[in-house]
């Protein structure tokens, strides 16, 4: 296999992985669980410091297995019951009794959460104290990327430069672009990418959960009721929007099921997966072609998002859905050129969507971007595309660079304003 393709598979394995619950509070749970492995006794108090952006994405989302919202319960549950070996599934086996114990610690004022100034978008430092003993774990640059461990002030671990590489830079130094992703997805041996079908399995289960039970705003179930009432039809567009939103409903509503995430985001993993799966069903393609389309969607999303920092003011579901739309064109038998049209169309359609934290209404944003993906892939199949208008360049690679510039140079103050509004 080509060395370049091996790099692509390594990238996917690194950042497309199961995650139980919204990844920002789960980062605190994971840090707390790792810190607990250093402390010889159960903690009596917990201190959590996080970046503004991690704070923003933890304020309104349920922590799975707890039925509660926020960083305090995430850190307390992680410290008292988390599995430090489970990564983003750290809280998979938390019991109601352990949640009660964690809440007791919070009610006693023993769990403190505060924002801290840092240049990192993803930053979390958790300190556990018991008597005179203290264990500290610092996460920086990625949701499970441990930068430092200390016990009683003594450094016991520090990440080397390679380990400390931020997820936003994951494609640095790698020969990658939309065309190389497209060719890779088409030509790589099936057995090398068969693992990506796990994304279909996990995220489809979340969708089923969101359709069968009331989570969050019930965006998916509301659409189902509309179909049953004859108000809207069960066509491809509505089916994709309904089932994608349902998975996000369950995800943000605290369902105790993992999502296959994409670059640290469960919702974006859902947005990269469900529209592709439903389109594959519509066109009755083989399992192999579905796997190739999922690779195209997930790696395409990773590549586009590598042009700007994680947890910015820009909602990443937009560009994730652009990559999904590219894969949908492929499933429908379209050309590479038409796949590029799909990316251009989605970004033109919904690139103004901002991120104001992780919460139940993220399911609405997922539904919006997924709807854009369907419209855009249908337009692309008719060779209709946005080109040379606004931030959309004539070339898809230039458009992607423009998105990076817009977020990096134009949305920093937007991010600060959003966080300040949310903190009022």
From Swiss-Prot:
GO terms, molecular function: L-cysteine desulfhydrase activity
Matches recorded under InterPro entries: Ser_deHydtase-like_asu, UPF0597
Signal peptide as annotated in the record: none
GO terms of biological process kind: L-cysteine catabolic process to pyruvate
Assigned protein family: Belongs to the UPF0597 family.
HAMAP family: UPF0597 (MF_01845)
Protein name per Swiss-Prot or TrEMBL: UPF0597 protein Shewmr4_2793
Native source species: Shewanella sp. (strain MR-4)
């Amino acid at each position: 296999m080509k060395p370049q393709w091996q790099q692509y598979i390594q990238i996917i394995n690194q950042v497309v992985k199961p995650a139980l619950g919204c990844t920002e509070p789960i980062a605190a749970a994971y840090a707390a669980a790792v810190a607990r492995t250093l402390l010889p006794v159960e903690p009596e108090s917990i201190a959590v410091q996080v970046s503004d952006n991690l704070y923003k994405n933890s304020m309104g989302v349920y922590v799975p297995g707890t039925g509660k919202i926020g960083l305090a319960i995430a850190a307390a549950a992680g410290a008292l019951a988390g599995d430090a070996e489970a990564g983003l599934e750290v809280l998979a086996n938390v019991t109601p009794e352990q949640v009660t114990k964690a809440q007791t610690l919070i009610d006693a004022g023993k769990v403190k959460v505060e924002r801290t100034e840092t240049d990192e978008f993803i930053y979390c430092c958790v300190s556990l104290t018991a008597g005179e003993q203290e264990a500290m774990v610092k996460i920086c640059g990625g949701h499970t990327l441990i930068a430092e461990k200390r016990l009683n002030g003594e450094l016991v671990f520090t990440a080397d430069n390679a380990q400390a590489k931020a997820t936003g830079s994951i494609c640095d130094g790698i020969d990658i672009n939309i065309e190389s992703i497209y060719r890779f997805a088409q030509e790589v041996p099936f057995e090398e990418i068969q693992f990506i079908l796990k994304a279909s399995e996990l995220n489809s289960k979340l969708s089923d959960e969101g359709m069968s039970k009331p989570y969050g705003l019930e965006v998916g179930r509301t659409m189902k009721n509309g179909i049953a009432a004859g108000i809207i039809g069960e066509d491809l567009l509505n089916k994709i929007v309904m089932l994608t939103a349902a998975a996000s409903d369950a995800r943000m509503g605290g369902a105790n099921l993992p999502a296959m995430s994409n670059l640290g985001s469960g919702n974006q993993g859902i947005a990269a997966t469900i529209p592709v799966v439903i389109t594959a069903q519509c066109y009755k393609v083989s399992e192999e072609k579905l796997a190739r389309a999922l690779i195209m969607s997930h790696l395409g999303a990773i590549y586009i998002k590598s042009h700007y920092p994680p947890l910015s003011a820009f909602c990443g579901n937009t560009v994730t859905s652009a990559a999904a739309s590219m894969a949908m064109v492929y499933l429908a038998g379209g050309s590479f050129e038409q796949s590029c049209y799909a990316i251009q169309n989605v970004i033109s359609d919904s690139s103004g969507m901002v991120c104001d934290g992780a919460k139940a209404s993220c399911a609405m944003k997922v539904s919006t971007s997924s709807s854009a993906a369907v419209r855009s892939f249908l337009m692309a199949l008719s060779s209709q595309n946005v080109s040379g208008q606004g931030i959309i360049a004539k070339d898809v690679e230039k458009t992607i660079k423009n998105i990076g510039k817009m977020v990096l140079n134009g949305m920093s103050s937007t991010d600060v304003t959003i966080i300040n509004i949310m903190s009022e």
